[in-house]
Amino acid sequence: MASFCLSRCCALRGSTAVGWSLRTIGTSRVSLAGEGERPPPMIDLEDKSLPIPIYKEKHNEPLKLQKSRLLYQSRKRGMLENGLLLSTFAAKYLESLDARQTKLYDTLINMPTNDWDIFYWATGVKPTPQEYDNEIMNMLKEHVKNANKEKRLCQPALY
Protein backbone atom coordinates (compact mmCIF):
# COMPACT_ATOMS: atom_id res chain seq x y z
CA MET A 1 0.00 0.00 0.00
CA ALA A 2 2.81 2.40 0.88
CA SER A 3 4.58 1.74 -2.43
CA PHE A 4 1.31 2.27 -4.32
CA CYS A 5 0.70 5.56 -2.53
CA LEU A 6 4.29 6.61 -3.06
CA SER A 7 4.35 5.69 -6.75
CA ARG A 8 0.89 7.20 -7.33
CA CYS A 9 1.94 10.37 -5.51
CA CYS A 10 5.15 10.60 -7.54
CA ALA A 11 3.27 9.96 -10.78
CA LEU A 12 0.77 12.70 -10.03
CA ARG A 13 3.51 15.15 -9.16
CA GLY A 14 5.67 14.11 -12.09
CA SER A 15 8.59 13.62 -9.77
CA THR A 16 10.48 11.04 -7.79
CA ALA A 17 10.47 10.53 -4.06
CA VAL A 18 14.19 11.12 -3.76
CA GLY A 19 14.78 14.02 -1.43
CA TRP A 20 11.17 14.27 -0.30
CA SER A 21 10.40 14.00 3.38
CA LEU A 22 7.79 11.54 4.55
CA ARG A 23 5.82 14.47 5.91
CA THR A 24 5.50 15.93 2.41
CA ILE A 25 4.37 12.63 0.96
CA GLY A 26 2.05 11.87 3.87
CA THR A 27 0.22 15.18 3.69
CA SER A 28 -0.13 15.44 -0.08
CA ARG A 29 -3.60 14.80 -1.39
CA VAL A 30 -3.80 11.96 -3.85
CA SER A 31 -6.97 11.51 -5.84
CA LEU A 32 -7.83 7.95 -6.78
CA ALA A 33 -10.09 9.24 -9.53
CA GLY A 34 -8.63 9.56 -13.01
CA GLU A 35 -8.22 12.82 -14.91
CA GLY A 36 -11.62 14.45 -15.38
CA GLU A 37 -13.40 11.86 -13.19
CA ARG A 38 -15.30 12.71 -10.06
CA PRO A 39 -14.01 11.11 -6.87
CA PRO A 40 -16.17 8.32 -5.47
CA PRO A 41 -18.84 9.58 -3.03
CA MET A 42 -18.45 8.88 0.67
CA ILE A 43 -21.24 6.57 1.71
CA ASP A 44 -22.03 5.68 5.30
CA LEU A 45 -22.87 1.99 4.96
CA GLU A 46 -22.44 -0.68 7.58
CA ASP A 47 -20.45 -3.70 6.44
CA LYS A 48 -22.86 -6.59 7.02
CA SER A 49 -20.11 -9.15 6.44
CA LEU A 50 -18.37 -8.21 9.70
CA PRO A 51 -20.05 -9.87 12.67
CA ILE A 52 -20.72 -7.44 15.48
CA PRO A 53 -21.09 -9.12 18.86
CA ILE A 54 -24.45 -8.56 20.47
CA TYR A 55 -24.25 -6.78 23.81
CA LYS A 56 -25.24 -9.05 26.66
CA GLU A 57 -26.89 -7.25 29.53
CA LYS A 58 -25.25 -7.94 32.86
CA HIS A 59 -27.89 -9.14 35.30
CA ASN A 60 -27.47 -8.76 39.07
CA GLU A 61 -24.48 -6.46 38.66
CA PRO A 62 -24.04 -4.27 41.75
CA LEU A 63 -24.78 -0.60 41.03
CA LYS A 64 -21.32 0.55 42.09
CA LEU A 65 -19.65 -2.00 39.79
CA GLN A 66 -21.99 -1.05 36.95
CA LYS A 67 -21.11 2.63 37.33
CA SER A 68 -17.39 1.80 37.38
CA ARG A 69 -17.79 -0.21 34.17
CA LEU A 70 -19.80 2.57 32.52
CA LEU A 71 -17.19 5.15 33.50
CA TYR A 72 -14.53 3.03 31.81
CA GLN A 73 -16.71 2.43 28.73
CA SER A 74 -17.51 6.15 28.50
CA ARG A 75 -13.80 6.94 28.33
CA LYS A 76 -12.70 4.15 25.96
CA ARG A 77 -14.93 4.59 22.94
CA GLY A 78 -12.46 4.22 20.09
CA MET A 79 -13.31 7.62 18.68
CA LEU A 80 -12.21 10.92 20.15
CA GLU A 81 -15.54 12.72 19.76
CA ASN A 82 -17.56 10.23 21.81
CA GLY A 83 -14.69 9.73 24.23
CA LEU A 84 -14.80 13.43 25.07
CA LEU A 85 -18.59 13.76 25.12
CA LEU A 86 -19.33 10.62 27.11
CA SER A 87 -16.41 10.90 29.54
CA THR A 88 -17.33 14.47 30.48
CA PHE A 89 -21.00 13.46 30.72
CA ALA A 90 -20.13 10.49 32.96
CA ALA A 91 -17.88 12.63 35.17
CA LYS A 92 -20.69 15.14 35.62
CA TYR A 93 -23.75 12.89 36.01
CA LEU A 94 -22.92 9.20 36.51
CA GLU A 95 -22.57 9.25 40.30
CA SER A 96 -25.96 10.94 40.73
CA LEU A 97 -27.89 8.52 38.48
CA ASP A 98 -30.22 6.05 40.16
CA ALA A 99 -30.39 2.36 39.15
CA ARG A 100 -33.04 2.92 36.47
CA GLN A 101 -31.19 5.85 34.91
CA THR A 102 -27.91 3.92 35.05
CA LYS A 103 -29.55 1.08 33.12
CA LEU A 104 -30.78 3.58 30.50
CA TYR A 105 -27.25 4.98 30.16
CA ASP A 106 -25.85 1.45 29.89
CA THR A 107 -28.31 0.67 27.09
CA LEU A 108 -27.55 3.94 25.32
CA ILE A 109 -23.79 3.51 25.14
CA ASN A 110 -23.70 -0.27 24.59
CA MET A 111 -26.66 -1.26 22.42
CA PRO A 112 -26.14 0.77 19.23
CA THR A 113 -23.64 -1.02 16.98
CA ASN A 114 -22.21 2.19 15.57
CA ASP A 115 -20.66 4.84 17.81
CA TRP A 116 -21.28 7.47 15.14
CA ASP A 117 -25.02 6.97 15.64
CA ILE A 118 -24.69 8.00 19.29
CA PHE A 119 -22.70 11.07 18.24
CA TYR A 120 -25.21 12.05 15.54
CA TRP A 121 -28.18 11.60 17.90
CA ALA A 122 -26.53 13.61 20.68
CA THR A 123 -25.58 16.45 18.35
CA GLY A 124 -28.96 16.48 16.59
CA VAL A 125 -27.61 15.52 13.16
CA LYS A 126 -29.91 12.48 13.04
CA PRO A 127 -33.19 11.96 14.87
CA THR A 128 -32.93 9.74 17.94
CA PRO A 129 -34.72 6.38 17.57
CA GLN A 130 -37.60 5.90 19.97
CA GLU A 131 -35.87 3.17 22.00
CA TYR A 132 -33.04 5.59 22.91
CA ASP A 133 -35.10 8.77 23.20
CA ASN A 134 -35.34 9.05 26.98
CA GLU A 135 -34.30 11.30 29.85
CA ILE A 136 -30.65 10.21 29.65
CA MET A 137 -30.47 11.07 25.95
CA ASN A 138 -32.06 14.44 26.73
CA MET A 139 -29.44 15.02 29.44
CA LEU A 140 -26.70 14.08 26.96
CA LYS A 141 -28.11 16.45 24.33
CA GLU A 142 -28.11 19.29 26.86
CA HIS A 143 -24.57 18.37 27.87
CA VAL A 144 -23.48 18.48 24.22
CA LYS A 145 -24.91 22.00 23.83
CA ASN A 146 -22.38 23.12 26.47
CA ALA A 147 -24.39 26.16 27.58
CA ASN A 148 -21.71 27.12 30.13
CA LYS A 149 -18.97 27.02 27.46
CA GLU A 150 -16.82 24.61 29.46
CA LYS A 151 -13.48 23.60 27.94
CA ARG A 152 -13.63 19.98 26.91
CA LEU A 153 -10.32 19.45 25.19
CA CYS A 154 -9.44 16.29 27.07
CA GLN A 155 -11.10 13.72 29.24
CA PRO A 156 -11.51 14.65 32.91
CA ALA A 157 -9.24 13.10 35.51
CA LEU A 158 -10.55 9.89 37.01
CA TYR A 159 -10.08 10.88 40.64
Swiss-Prot record:
Signal peptide: none annotated. InterPro entries: SDH, SDH_sf, SDHAF2. Disulfide bonds: none annotated. The keyword Chaperone applies. Its main location: mitochondrion. This is Succinate dehydrogenase assembly factor 2, mitochondrial. One of its GO terms (biological process) is mitochondrial respiratory chain complex II assembly. The lineage of its organism: Eukaryota, Metazoa, Ecdysozoa, Arthropoda, Hexapoda. It is found in: Mitochondrion matrix. Residues 1-14 form a transit peptide. Keywords: Chaperone, Mitochondrion, Transit peptide. Interacts with the flavoprotein subunit within the SDH catalytic dimer. It comes from Culex quinquefasciatus. The keyword Cell inner membrane does not apply. SUPFAM superfamilies: YgfY-like. GO terms for cellular component: mitochondrial matrix; mitochondrion. Plays an essential role in the assembly of succinate dehydrogenase (SDH), an enzyme complex (also referred to as respiratory complex II) that is a component of both the tricarboxylic acid (TCA) cycle and the mitochondrial electron transport chain, and which couples the oxidation of succinate to fumarate with the reduction of ubiquinone (coenzyme Q) to ubiquinol. Required for flavinylation (covalent attachment of FAD) of the flavoprotein subunit of the SDH catalytic dimer. Belongs to the SDHAF2 family.
